[in-house]
């Protein structure tokens, strides 16, 4: 029961922080460098998600589960304290009603529709890993492949964010849609783990190209005075349709 409760609180915290965080990134970065800014965020976030479990694995024999959980709370506490050093630009209260979709741009509404449809096709990374196991990869091999996927994602996210700034955020998002379709077609076609691994690493390219560019492109479609609310609505719609 306690594990379920804390997991629920963890997901609640993620829901509360995502929209304001993305809005802060959008306000803190020049418009011509949004791809790099979000790419850097995705890179560091993924790198942390890769190194964290590895460190936990090393520390588990020394500290036990409770010790690892206590130690894991320290980075979150440090991040919370660092937020007090962030200074937001003062602005008058938003004149728009909360989540007034009709007041948002047609471009945003179209992007919300496209993203919602895309969310219906999204599935958990676990399905790809199960496919690797089905094709004969060992449990250890699957774990190593997923670690390499995350590492490649982390290494590529920032440079591909910069590329998105140069070629256009919308084009990079469209490229991401195409890569995702190609990856899932590839996993359906693959008859050996070798080919599936190739498509898993192509999936890392998709993640690095799409995740940052998608958030950056969204930030260009929402009004300054309703940025956090519009981003929050986007994540709500996509999150519900993912279920």
Language model: regions and residue ranges:
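Helix-loop junctions at membrane interfaces in 12-TM secondary transporters
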Residues: 1-6, 188-199
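Cytoplasmic helix-loop-helix junction between adjacent transmembrane helices
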Residues: 6-47
């Amino acid at each position: 029961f306690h594990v379920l409760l804390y997991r629920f609180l963890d997901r609640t915290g993620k829901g509360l922080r995502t929209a304001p965080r993305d809005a802060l990134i959008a306000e803190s970065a020049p418009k011509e460098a949004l791809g790099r800014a979000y790419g850097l965020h995705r890179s560091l976030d993924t790198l942390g998600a890769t190194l964290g479990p590895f460190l936990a694995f090393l520390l588990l024999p020394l500290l036990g589960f409770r010790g690892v959980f206590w130690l894991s709370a320290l980075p979150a506490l440090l991040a919370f304290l660092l937020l007090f050093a962030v200074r937001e630009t003062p602005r008058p209260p938003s004149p728009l009603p909360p989540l007034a979709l009709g007041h948002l741009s047609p471009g945003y509404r179209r992007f919300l529709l496209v993203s919602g449809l895309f969310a219906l096709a999204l599935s958990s990374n676990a399905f790809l890993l199960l496919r690797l196991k089905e094709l004969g990869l060992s449990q250890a091999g699957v774990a190593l492949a997923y670690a390499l996927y995350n590492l490649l994602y982390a290494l590529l996210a920032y440079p591909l964010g910069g590329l998105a700034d140069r070629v256009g955020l919308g084009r990079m998002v469209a490229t991401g849609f195409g890569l995702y379709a190609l990856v899932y077609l590839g996993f359906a076609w693959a008859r050996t783990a070798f080919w599936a691994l190739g498509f898993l690493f192509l999936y890392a390219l998709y993640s690095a190209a799409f995740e940052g560019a998608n958030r950056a492109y969204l930030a260009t479609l929402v009004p300054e005075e309703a940025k956090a609310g519009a981003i929050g609505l986007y994540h709500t719609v996509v999150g519900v349709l993912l279920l």
